[in-house]
Swiss-Prot record:
Residues 239-254 have a biased composition (Acidic residues). It comes from the Bacteria. It comes from Streptomyces coelicolor (strain ATCC BAA-471 / A3(2) / M145). Belongs to the peptidase T1A family. Residues 231-254 are annotated as: Disordered. Disulfide bonds: none annotated. Gene3D superfamilies: Glutamine Phosphoribosylpyrophosphate, subunit 1, domain 1 (3.60.20.10). The lineage of its organism: Bacteria, Bacillati, Actinomycetota, Actinomycetes, Kitasatosporales. Keywords: Cytoplasm, Proteasome. The keyword Protein transport does not apply. Optimum temperature is 55 degrees Celsius. This is Proteasome subunit alpha. Component of the proteasome core, a large protease complex with broad specificity involved in protein degradation. The S.coelicolor proteasome is able to cleave oligopeptides after hydrophobic residues, but not after basic or acidic residues, thus displaying chymotrypsin-like activity but not trypsin-like activity.
Length: 254
């Protein structure tokens, strides 16, 4: 009778984490940014049928990178949780923090169970508040941990490089056009540092807009509206570049 092959618990967990990270890295990156009037979700997604971003409840949005069937199951579970809690108690009792805790328990249980493989997903749960100070953004990696994010967050294949780019350039009070332009610039940068162009038809964009009069703040941005915002953001960026150039020129003359 042969001796069973022994793997230490630490090595087993490390192998599962590496497996999940590699699966997530194969997915396209996405970013979530705060702007003056809410939170914007931006990702490269050539499919018109499969969405990376979805509404969970009135003020809560969901974003995910990784295996579609796995994060779609989580999304559906989140919608059911939110609907049941809002119906049983009150709509105000449905929060991003509560939903993030539910997702963390699910992901953590699956990750630590040897009976099934870990989920190859990374989630973002965001809730728009009455003011930017009350916005909430939570990132949930494959192991079920919760990271409280502020300003911007990136998940997916090139998340580390994109996060560094956003941290240097994102600022409070940006307009939607400015935030969208910054997000596209960040997503356009490849791992080798080169920049490529992402056409509007390959972008998936959604917002949680605190200024909407409706109770539901989630809205997708498509078609002509998306094109106009991209053009507006480009014009704003060009104007800032010209202003900086004139300032530098004036300083040289002095």
């Amino acid at each position: 009778m042969s001796t069973p092959f022994y793997v230490s618990p630490q090595q087993a967990m490390a192998d599962r984490a590496e497996y999940a990270r590699k699966g997530i890295a194969r997915g396209r990156s996405l970013v979530v940014l705060q702007y003056a009037d809410g939170i914007v979700f931006v990702g490269e997604n050539p499919s018109r049928a499969l969405h990376k971003f979805s509404e969970i409840y009135d003020r809560i949005g969901f974003a995910a990178a990784g295996k579609y069937n796995e994060y779609e199951n989580l999304r559906i579970g989140g919608v059911r949780y939110a609907d049941l809690r809002g119906y049983t108690y009150d709509r105000d009792d449905v929060t991003a923090r509560g939903l993030a805790n539910v997702y963390a328990q699910t992901l953590g249980t699956i990750f630590s169970s040897q009976a099934e493989k870990p989920y190859e997903v990374e989630l973002v749960v965001a809730e728009v508040g009455d003011s930017p100070e009350n916005d909430q953004i939570y990132r949930l990696p494959h192991d079920g941990s919760i990271v409280d994010e502020h300003g911007s967050v990136a998940v997916g294949g090139n998340a580390e490089q994109i996060s560094g780019y956003l941290d240097q350039r994102h600022r409070d009070g940006m307009t939607l056009a400015e935030a969208l332009k910054l997000a596209v610039q960040a997503l356009s940068r490849d791992t080798n540092g080169t920049e490529r162009e992402i056409p509007a038809e390959r972008l998936e964009v959604a917002v949680l807009d605190r200024t909407r009069p409706q109770q539901r703040k989630f809205k997708r941005i498509v078609g002509g509206q998306l094109s106009r915002l991209l053009e507006s953001g480009a014009a704003s960026a060009d104007g800032e570049a010209e202003t900086e150039a004139e300032t530098d020129s004036g300083s040289d003359e002095e």
